[in-house]
């Protein structure tokens, strides 16, 4: 079994599918593609950790004019009843995301020095996190919550066969994305690449960059976000030697 982390979130801690089993084709009709897309998005939303997890890493930020910054980050995930709680902690603020089956994600951002977190919703999810190019909604994979999901094809990414999932919101919010394309590895359902668009223009590219075999399993070591509008970059580098709970 492989473990991947997509956007700091461990997705494939469930048993991988049999790679020798024939893959069902992508339907030729739009209705069938939407049904497949809805099922895929639901399965991704429903992934849960078996145990609590803690992973340390760094946000390596390159600003549009070349200035660089390094921000240590700690990712924690734990179960709370049927919900999964994911926490991204930095010296610049802490984001908590509560994911409950069949309910919208809940986001709470606690600024440095604040006693409690502020609930974030709507356009507030476009707020950047810790000076990086990640928004709060990016970290919560908010596009998987959108009502319009469609598998539009199949392609190889990082030498893995992937379904291409097209996600569209019910309404495009100011500063938000008009649609998102993601390449989902078929057997482990790991997101290997994500492209975010405004209108017909791609504005962000999220891509797994390197992996390392750790404790007998392949794990993501580096994820890069490229901002096509500003030419800024943010790399998340994970310390795979960090102890896990």
Regions found by a protein language model. Give the residues of each.
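Sec-dependent N-terminal signal peptides
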Residues: 4-12
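Flexible, processing/modification-adjacent segments and terminal tails
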Residues: 18-42, 48-49, 67, 101-178
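Extended lipid/amphipathic-ligand handling interfaces
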Residues: 42-44, 72-77, 207-213
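A short, Trp-centered hydrophobic/proline-enriched beta-strand micro-motif
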Residues: 48-64, 84
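Short hydrophobic/aromatic-rich beta-strand segments that constitute the beta-sheet cores
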Residues: 55, 83-87, 105-110, 118-119, ...
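Mid-chain, structured segments of secreted extracytoplasmic proteins
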Residues: 70-111
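Gly/Pro-enriched, hydrophobic low-complexity segments
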Residues: 158-245
